[in-house]
Design a protein with these regions (language model features):
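Two-component histidine phosphotransfer core
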Residues: 1-179
Length: 179
């Protein structure tokens, strides 16, 4: 069941990126389009490499997140900056395993929906080890989840990636420390 949910995630993510690339193509910015396609190919290669794995290292996840956010910056109509911080209490990021494609959908949701009314967006992703648990925080200076939900009620948009990710977390939570 976990694998089936993960497989739903990847096509949805790819669809979103391809729509962004299409928009760039329609704008006529050829150099930016080529750079974006190159960045997407690096990201896609990483996703495909990890697609058969149930878990990846935190270092791999951070690398994929960085590639994704850099790609999103290229495609976004709103400017935003990002930071990724790992406070791991002397633990190597290559020693920590997390489920594949678990954090990225939440960052994707933030990038796509948080900055509607913000001049310059900021995204901060942090990983911290406390009491043998890995905590992940995704913070932005956008409109806030309550306002986003209110606006979402008035639209037909349905966040498949968040729904699938929440289902994956629910499946993982009884047997592990993810939630």
């Amino acid at each position: 069941e976990q694998k089936a949910l993960q497989l739903q995630m990847n096509p949805h993510f790819i669809f979103n990126v391809l729509n962004g690339i299409k928009a760039l193509g329609n704008s006529g910015k050829i150099e930016e389009l080529n750079a974006t396609i190159s960045k997407f190919s690096v990201l896609l290669r990483g996703i495909l490499h990890n697609s058969r794995k149930e878990e990846i290292t935190l270092q791999e996840e951070i690398s994929l997140l960085k590639n994704y956010i850099e790609l999103a910056q290229r495609m976004s109509s709103k400017s935003f900056t990002f930071t990724i911080v790992a406070n791991l209490n002397n633990t190597d990021a290559d020693e920590i395993l997390i489920p594949t494609m678990l954090v990225q959908p939440f960052v994707e949701n933030c990038v796509q929906h948080a900055f509607k009314d913000t001049t310059l967006g900021e995204v901060s992703v942090s990983f911290e080890v406390k009491h043998h648990f890995l905590y992940c925080s995704i913070i932005d200076n956008g409109i806030g989840i309550h306002e986003a939900k209110k606006r979402k009620e008035n639209s037909i948009h349905n966040s498949v990636s968040l729904k699938v990710s929440k289902e994956r977390l629910h499946i993982l939570s009884p047997k592990s420390s993810f939630f």
